[in-house]
Amino acid sequence: MWVAWSARTAALALLLGALHGAPTRGQEYDYYGWQAEPLHGRSYSKPPQCLDIPADLPLCHTVGYKRMRLPNLLEHESLAEVKQQASSWLPLLAKRCHSDTQVFLCSLFAPVCLDRPIYPCRSLCEAARAGCAPLMEAYGFPWPEMLHCHKFPLDNDLCIAVQFGHLPATAPPVTKICAQCEMEHSADGLMEQMCSSDFVVKMRIKEIKIDNGDRKLIGAQKKKKLLKAGPLKRKDTKKLVLHMKNGASCPCPQLDNLTGSFLVMGRKVEGQLLLTAVYRWDKKNKEMKFAVKFMFSYPCSLYYPFFYGAAEPH
């Protein structure tokens, strides 16, 4: 794994080295017929500066270069702001939905320190979006406006192109199990999921239906226990229907047998209840019992949830 990562780092370093001798931004992007979108007319109190990528910026600390430029390409002026916003993307990076996710995100959050900003190529954005957008959608998050790929230049020698997309993913391997069915086995892991879910319910499942590429979990009328109600209203719980986005064709071992009770978590998005995690209820599981008992005293992160989701206003 170390050899593969070294090769990747070397490839990125060669690319960035070549960019040092590049023409100015205005000359180059005029030539390619692309202009960076204005930063909303925002004026900055400080001139651009370069600084080391700190160890407590884990999204980008291992990206392959050591120094970054501020303000970055997302208009963050301070390192504190970068850390706050970047931390919410760590869960997506951990999912390994595309080999170039880190390169793409860090080209925006922690752009390499050169005399002019270097943007990601449109193809890099499109590759990352193709790999990661379906996973984000499964948790109720659309691909964000700030990452729309039309904002970035068509491929040329002076933007950051796809680096590692042709290489196999490194461990942990990409799983074919539905994202909502990947299980945490520790109490802390379960409580993190509970933190980032709008609601948590112990319930029985009457049946499962397939609808436009999604699974619909139809709850039994009785035997429901709201452990975390969140935005759920009486009409939601009376006939509980959970949508498992993009879950029609991927396996979910927990749902192979619908006997017994389930611990389910989810988010309410535009009136629809989206399933984010499902476990078979096991009263002998000490980690699960601990998580359910102490979920409200767990110190949930403020900024962790862009991907798994701080609940949106309802």
From Swiss-Prot:
SMART domains: C345C, FRI. Its main location: secreted. Gene3D superfamilies: 2.40.50.120, Frizzled cysteine-rich domain. SUPFAM superfamilies: Frizzled cysteine-rich domain, TIMP-like. Residues 45-162 form the FZ domain. Residues 178-300 form the NTR domain. This is Secreted frizzled-related protein 5. It comes from Mus musculus (Mouse).
